[in-house]
Amino acid sequence: MDNVRGSIMLQPLPEIAESIDDAICHELSMWPDDAKDLLLIVEAISRGDLKLVLVACAKAVSENNLLMARWCMGELRGMVSISGEPIQRLGAYMLEGLVARLAASGSSIYKSLQSREPESYEFLSYVYVLHEVCPYFKFGYMSANGAIAEAMKDEERIHIIDFQIGQGSQWIALIQAFAARPGGAPNIRITGVGDGSVLVTVKKRLEKLAKKFDVPFRFNAVSRPSCEVEVENLDVRDGEALGVNFAYMLHHLPDESVSMENHRDRLLRMVKSLSPKVVTLVEQECNTNTSPFLPRFLETLSYYTAMFESIDVMLPRNHKERINIEQHCMARDVVNIIACEGAERIERHELLGKWKSRFSMAGFEPYPLSSIISATIRALLRDYSNGYAIEERDGALYLGWMDRILVSSCAWK
């Protein structure tokens, strides 16, 4: 996609006018603002400029201009498609978010989103396919595992706490790596926080793997939301080297802007009190936590455009699961970011700079990722599109698509 055109399209409507013929702009300057906006939108529709119409609709919603918003929504319905170009697919879900925002608020929106969730096993199957075709999960898991393996290289008793264990896929490679350690594998305990029904499957899966590779292993299941986890749930024991993993989960915790309880910082302080040897953080490099609605919409449009374009390269449009993957792994996030506010908006991403501030305030110090980890991940990316790139900066790793950073990874102690 043309970068110059893309940057113009992400500007507010009065600034977009600068890209139009000078004569038209002069004429528009004599018109009321609503008339100017309307003409710009009509021109955007006629040339199929979906991004501009999306931004115009979001601007109308933010200004509570119901007539303009509903007219834009009607036009957008004829421009978006869940089986079209990346921007058409993303546009379909962003439109859904705008409609939901205009129609309702708070818990009613969140409940309507929840009602469309697939069963846990079904959702995890979609995540698995995404894991295989795009490097986002592998990047995060490999960088975190590398930091944990390095920190634990001389330890004989290891306890890893994963605050969002999912399928437990991250730990397969690490268990195998520990099994290959000269002199024998260490004793490993993994505490997994997650959905109770899934934890049973994860426990059996990891126990079977550990037995196959002759690794002493135990699994501790914590079936409760991460924000409700207390020290006594984690079964931390003396004599065990502790590692803690926060992979794609801290952004789900409400911070001080949502609740006085501030679970985001509370959890970090609690983990610091356990004296872990290493703590790993993997997060989407996106700024949607405290931003007002319109800037948040623009950031979401920019970020997920890159995400959908990268998936389009790796997963054919006729792939039978692609729509399900996009709908359940990303679209729900997009709709939540756009439609919801307050406690009902659970997708609250922050940039790594803000995460660094939070970790520092909780008493952590950086644990720089080694060059070996970045070299390993660079080798991994050879299996994917050359549109992906790795950047190593200030002890952290960044994964990007074209000129947009999508994921960051770092470690702390």
Curated annotation (Swiss-Prot):
Q: Where is this region: SAW?
A: 339-413
Q: What does this protein do?
A: Probable transcription factor involved in plant development.
Expression tissues: Expressed in seedlings, roots, cotyledons, leaves and flowers.
Q: Where is this region: PFYRE?
A: 242-336
Q: Name one GO molecular function term.
A: DNA-binding transcription factor activity
Transmembrane regions: none
Say which domain of life the source belongs to. Eukaryota
- Provide the residue span(s) of the region labelled Leucine repeat I (LRI): 48-108
Assembly information from the UniProt record: Interacts with Meloidogyne incognita 16D10.
- The entry's protein name is Scarecrow-like protein 21
Q: Name one GO cellular component term.
A: nucleus
Entry-linked InterPro entries? TF_GRAS
Instruction: Tell me its family.
Output: Belongs to the GRAS family.
Q: What stretch or stretches form a coiled coil here?
A: none
Region Leucine repeat II (LRII), residue ranges: 201-233
Pfam families named in the record: GRAS
Cell location: Nucleus
Using the UniProt record, give the first listed, main subcellular location. Answer: nucleus
Keyword entries, A-Z: Nucleus, Transcription, Transcription regulation
Motif VHIID is found at 158-162
Q: Which GO terms are recorded in the biological process aspect for this UniProt protein?
A: regulation of DNA-templated transcription
Chain positions covered by the region annotation VHIID: 127-192
Domain GRAS residue range list: 41-413
